[in-house]
Regions:
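Conserved hydrophobic positions within beta-strands
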Residues: 6-8, 65, 93, 100
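Short aromatic/basic micro-patch
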Residues: 19, 59, 92, 117
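Conserved active-site neighborhood of the chymotrypsin/trypsin-like protease fold
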Residues: 1-51, 55-58, 73-77, 132-137
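C-terminal cap/linker of serine protease catalytic domains
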Residues: 28, 53, 100-165
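A residue-level detector for short acidic-glycine micro-motifs
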Residues: 8-10, 67, 105
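Active-site-proximal beta-strand/loop segments in catalytic clefts of secreted hydrolases
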Residues: 22-23, 50-52, 82-83, 103-107
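Catalytic nucleophile loop of clan PA
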Residues: 83-104
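Short, compositionally biased
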Residues: 60-71, 116-118
Length: 165
């Protein structure tokens, strides 16, 4: 099935996350999966990475959580030995209960069984604050988070700006 007319609602370049809006169709509903609490993830826990690695559709890789606190560029990742290759990064990392515990993000080139996923706590923060990450193709700062979400123009009313001395 091919889905067209997908819109980018929000994006975060630093986390490599995007929120997409799918068109509504009366004859089709989209399934959803729960996001697990990050605090419940344990080392040794079985996990499953789903995606299309190397263009092979509908592929599942199994592994275990190696650590829940692997740091890169100021972010903590879930490290797993489930295979994460080009094509399945960006897919869900599930626990045995079918709950998403992370979004597969990267693997180490030349290193087998070294995969990493963004924990759901970052995903939940991104979703809660999606207005701060709102996508605007005409804005070069799209996807950058501001300390306070920038006001958006609505109904033709410009945002109020404060003067500084």
């Amino acid at each position: 099935r091919t889905i067209e007319d997908i819109e980018i609602e929000a994006m975060n370049d630093h986390l490599d996350l995007a929120l997409l809006k799918l068109p509504t169709e009366e004859d089709h509903s989209y399934p959803w999966v729960p996001l697990e609490l990050w605090e419940s993830i344990e080392v040794g826990q079985p996990v499953f990475a789903i995606g299309n690695p190397m263009g092979l559709e509908q592929t599942t890789s199994q592994g275990v959580v190696s650590t829940t606190q692997r740091s890169f560029d100021g972010l903590s990742y879930i490290q797993t030995d489930a295979a994460i290759n080009p094509g399945n990064s960006g897919g869900p990392l599930f626990n045995v209960s079918g709950e998403v515990i992370g979004i597969t993000n990267m693997g180490i080139l030349g290193g087998e069984a070294l995969g990493f996923a963004i924990p759901t706590r970052y995903v939940k923060d991104f979703l809660r604050n999606r207005e701060a990450f709102a996508y605007d193709p005409s804005n070069p700062n799209t996807g950058h988070r501001y300390h306070i979400p920038p006001p958006r123009q609505q109904a033709g009313i410009a945002p109020q700006l404060e003067k500084t001395q």
